[in-house]
Structure formats: C-alpha cells, structure tokens
C-alpha cells in the first residue's frame, strides 16, 4: 500500500513510520483517521483526530524529519511506554517531539491549544503559541483562530500523555480544530508557520 492509501484507509489499524534526515525533530500523530471517520477501535480513546496524519506528514516533509502515524489504532499509543508508538519515538531519540491532535470544539477553550504537558513547562508552550499567533496574524484565513499555550487556560493539557510528559525529549501537544484540519489551504499555511518556528527552536 502507498502512504496515501494507508492514510485514507477507514478501517485497518496501522503504525506507519516515515524516515527523515533531521532526527533532532520528530512528528507524532497517535489518533489519525481519514476525514469522515469519527471513531477509533479503542475503548479508552474512541474519538479520532480526523486528518491529522496528512497534516503531520506534510509538516515532516517540510522539516525533512521522521514522522510516526498511528491510524485507526486499537490502543491509545501515547499513553503507554510499552506501546510500539512510544518505543519507536524512543528509538529515534529526537530533541523535540511535535504531536498533532484534533478536537471537535466542544471542550476546548481555544481553537488551537498547545501544551508541553505540565505547569513547569508552560513557558515553552506559551512561547510556541505566541509565535504561531503572530504568524497567523498575517493570513486573513487564519487570523481569527484563537491560540493559547497557557497551562492554566487551556483544556487539553496532555497531563496523561507519556510521550509529552517525559524528560527524554521536549514535547509539544498541539490540538487543532476540525475546520482547520479539513481545509488543505489552511493546514498547509499552519505547517509553513510551524516549520519556521520549529527550525528556530
């Protein structure tokens, strides 16, 4: 199967690893499903993050860095150190992990929420959020999205994610709204903005 065939597969569970030269950075996507597939075969994480695999892969292409995508997955892979997802990230050993997630808008306090997993690291997520907000301000299609990395203010704090809460690498958990995830023009601009920010880390 081709990469796009995997990412568009609405049924089969898979973990796909796409290598890249810049191993200082790694992109992770633990809950991908194609657009229109809202559910995962996972009791502890039944809601999918639609289309996040395509976004993560596009960002990894721009950065020429490794990308790891779990699609239609039967476990919640970023919550267990024993998962093949966690072990692959550990084997690569990046300095920075960028995890792409999606939300439906019902619980989020902001359109885009960024967490580094704990209050102690809030300064990192706030800095990334501020830079992304500044980048979005020059694009008419993006400037109205609200963005926060303030641990006190956001809903999706990623406190239970073991890929985020670790000292093995610096990690950012990025929650994206459905509207942005389903619009290629918008998510390509997002990826271009993130590429510039991440290269300067």
Where are these regions (language model features)?
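N-terminal catalytic or cofactor-binding beta/alpha core of small enzyme domains
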Residues: 1-201
